[in-house]
């Protein structure tokens, strides 16, 4: 039987809960671990879609911010979001930033680069088929560059091992998204990742800190399985060529002005959720918020039941 080592629960407690819980988990991660061989993550990995299939494939509804620690800046940005924006030639091939790219459909190839003379591990490389991105995680203790260094889609990443867990710190990210419905991530965001391998299963957990758009850390995780079959070459190629999909005047960008979004109430009404829940915020992440949802629903009009079926021609409905 394979023993699963799942860091997610401890990580959530460490970064999201203040006080005793935070201190306890920080001491736990900082405590000495027995020396052991570093885990090799090399191989071809495929994403596993479980309970978050609707989130990661079909995508979230417009103005669904439930359970996300966003602030008013993020809400204002996302409230103006028009999905038609991605039809712009400038947006069609825009690369996903590293905190977002692992969550979508992709193939992942991992390999190690070692010094040819000393065989010391210098870097871990990730080739991500989505937008054909090669990401470098430096393992040679080099420092991160200064604040004026260039920002990239993948950012600048350094890693180290804590026992059998690979910990990666990433800075110098370009502005991107944390969700497909327009919730943004700023270029001041930083990310800490935790990679854990159990046989042919790899769990990737990331903690995102963004002083511009988040009030607390955003924690997400996804699983990958190691592929043992040969992957066709075309699966690694992301063909993207911008074209004009919709004729528009030069300089026009699809967007909505404040409070003019035609679907601003749709998600809450369809899912019978009060505005306090729909608008998100750190408080909506915690179990205690359930009482707010229950109380808010009491003042809402229940959704109307569907109409009865129309009577058959020439007779009454049964």
Regions found by a protein language model. Give the residues of each.
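N-terminal secretory signal peptides that target proteins for export/translocation
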Residues: 1-16
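PEST-like low-complexity, intrinsically disordered acidic/proline/serine-rich tracts
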Residues: 2, 34-318
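Bacterial N-terminal signal peptides
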Residues: 13, 17-31
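Helix-centric, low-specificity signal for extended rod-like, repetitive segments
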Residues: 7-10, 26, 68, 87
């Amino acid at each position: 039987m394979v023993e699963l080592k799942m860091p997610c629960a401890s990580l959530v407690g460490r970064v999201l809960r203040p006080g005793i819980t935070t201190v306890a988990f920080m001491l736990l991660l900082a405590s000495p671990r027995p020396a052991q061989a570093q885990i090799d993550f090399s191989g071809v990995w495929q994403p596993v879609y479980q309970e978050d299939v609707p989130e990661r494939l079909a995508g979230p509804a417009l103005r669904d911010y439930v359970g996300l620690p966003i602030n008013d800046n993020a809400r204002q940005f996302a409230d103006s979001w028009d999905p038609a924006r991605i039809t712009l030639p400038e947006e069609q091939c825009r690369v996903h930033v590293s905190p977002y790219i692992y969550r979508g459909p992709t193939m992942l190839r991992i390999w190690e680069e070692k010094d040819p003379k000393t065989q010391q591990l210098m870097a871990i490389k990730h080739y991500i088929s989505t937008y054909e991105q090669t990401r470098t995680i430096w393992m040679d203790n080099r420092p991160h560059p200064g604040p004026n260094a260039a920002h990239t889609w993948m950012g600048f990443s350094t890693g180290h091992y804590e026992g059998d867990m690979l910990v990666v710190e990433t800075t110098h990210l370009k502005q991107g998204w944390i969700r497909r419905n327009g919730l943004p991530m700023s270029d001041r965001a930083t990310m800490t990742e935790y990679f854990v391998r159990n046989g042919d299963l790899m769990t990737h957990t990331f903690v995102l800190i963004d002083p511009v758009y988040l009030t607390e850390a955003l924690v997400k995780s996804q699983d990958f399985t190691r592929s043992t079959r040969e992957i066709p070459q075309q699966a690694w190629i992301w063909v993207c060529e911008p074209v004009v999909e919709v004729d528009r005047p030069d300089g026009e960008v699809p967007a909505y002005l404040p409070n003019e979004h035609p679907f601003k109430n749709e998600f809450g009404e369809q899912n019978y959720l009060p505005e306090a829940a729909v608008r998100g915020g750190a408080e909506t992440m915690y179990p205690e918020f359930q009482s707010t949802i229950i109380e808010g629903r009491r003042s809402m009009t229940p959704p109307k039941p569907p109409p009865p079926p129309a009577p058959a021609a020439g007779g009454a409905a049964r």
